[in-house]
A protein has these predicted regions:
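Extended alpha-helical surfaces
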Residues: 1-165
């Protein structure tokens, strides 16, 4: 349905700076999508298949992370049973404990990215692909401007400010 628009979108890769911003994507999408699909996309309406599936995945992911934290802090963890199970989350969470917080955040976002790929592997030109692309773009934008050099500068300036007090 959205063949031309989908085909014109630049490729996104996890961990790389995206070639366009979310605002630019939304402006292009507004010209290409039906008004109904545009509203659903920008609202991340769970009635759209990708957004509904990602909401369930995200709830499961966050619940499992909260359970792991509660277990680590020896706190009671009385969480509701999820409506769906995602083995890839359970398998990955055990390995994430060894990572530093920044690496862990990237690994969790990679889980999200892979789930989006799984949801749209057979729909490269439809509305589901457009919705998944928008979520991936949001994930990629989160890391825009983040790099070790910039992080080191902020850290060094914070240490200097604390030393001067």
């Amino acid at each position: 349905m959205y063949d031309f628009f989908s085909a014109s979108l630049p490729e996104l890769r996890p961990g790389e700076t995206p070639p366009l911003t979310l605002a630019e994507f939304d402006a292009d999408a507004e010209l290409q999508l039906t008004p109904r699909h545009y509203r659903m996309m920008t609202a991340e309406d769970p009635a759209a298949r990708v957004y509904g599936a990602m909401r369930r995945f995200e709830e499961y992911l966050r619940t499992r992370i909260a359970e792991k934290r509660a277990e680590k802090l020896k706190m009671p963890a009385d969480f509701a049973e999820p409506e769906a199970f995602y083995g890839e989350v359970d398998a990955a969470l055990g390995q994430l404990a060894q990572l530093d917080p920044a690496e862990r955040e990237r690994a969790v976002d990679l889980l999200r990215w892979k789930k989006l790929d799984e949801l749209t592997w057979n729909d490269e030109f439809g509305f589901d692909h457009i919705c998944a692309y928008r979520v991936k773009l949001r994930l990629a934008e989160k890391y825009r401007g983040r790099d070790a050099g910039t992080g080191r500068k902020f850290f060094d300036s914070a240490v200097r400010a604390m030393a001067e007090q």
